[in-house]
Swiss-Prot record:
One of its GO terms (biological process) is uracil salvage. It catalyses: UMP + diphosphate = 5-phospho-alpha-D-ribose 1-diphosphate + uracil. The keyword Cell division does not apply. Catalyzes the conversion of uracil and 5-phospho-alpha-D-ribose 1-diphosphate (PRPP) to UMP and diphosphate. It comes from Ruminiclostridium cellulolyticum (strain ATCC 35319 / DSM 5812 / JCM 6584 / H10) (Clostridium cellulolyticum). Keywords: Allosteric enzyme, Glycosyltransferase, GTP-binding, Magnesium, Nucleotide-binding, Transferase. Pathway: Pyrimidine metabolism; UMP biosynthesis via salvage pathway; UMP from uracil: step 1/1. This is Uracil phosphoribosyltransferase. Its cofactor is Mg(2+).
Amino acid sequence: MENVFVFDHPLIQHKISLLRDKNTNTKEFRELVSEIAMLMGYEVTRNMPLKEVEIETPIGMAKTKVISGKKLGIVPILRAGLGMVDGMLRLIPMAKVGHIGLYRDPESLQPVEYYCKLPVDVEEREIVVLDPMLATGGSASAAIQFIKNRGVKNIKLMCLIAAKAGIERMQKDHPDVGIYCASVDEILNDHAYIVPGLGDAGDRLFGTK
């Protein structure tokens, strides 16, 4: 699968297994989502450009490197994407955070937008879209198209679990967008939930039904 990156790090795989467990409670689920997002964020940001600078240490002068080039923006898809934000901000505390609110119509299964707030300089940033579950790919594709319409050229999608159908939809609609995930599951059920998946990520994050 081109432009799809599946992380097989032992810590990520262990924590994904705990996420899948139906007996994992809400507090533990939230913590795991945040931890996995931080671990994945380390890899997602691997290719950020660096520049050399000179700084003064307590002992003397040193040539070292800092991140340069485009600034990073994080855009969670509401509501489940919110669970991944803190983990990313632990790595990149200066990143700007936008929000896109989408829900899936229960009849048509198509995404419906109800909220959008992006950084004013979003077109100057590299954007990482956060969505724990890539199921049909409809919501992620719609969110990414909206971001592209704002002039953004460099976009990545970070999710915890992806279904093959969602990956195929993304590759059809946005072949230029890299997909970063911890696991790929084979199928969707009749309600467009990933199988075996982990259930409804939003409900498990926020203790709702």
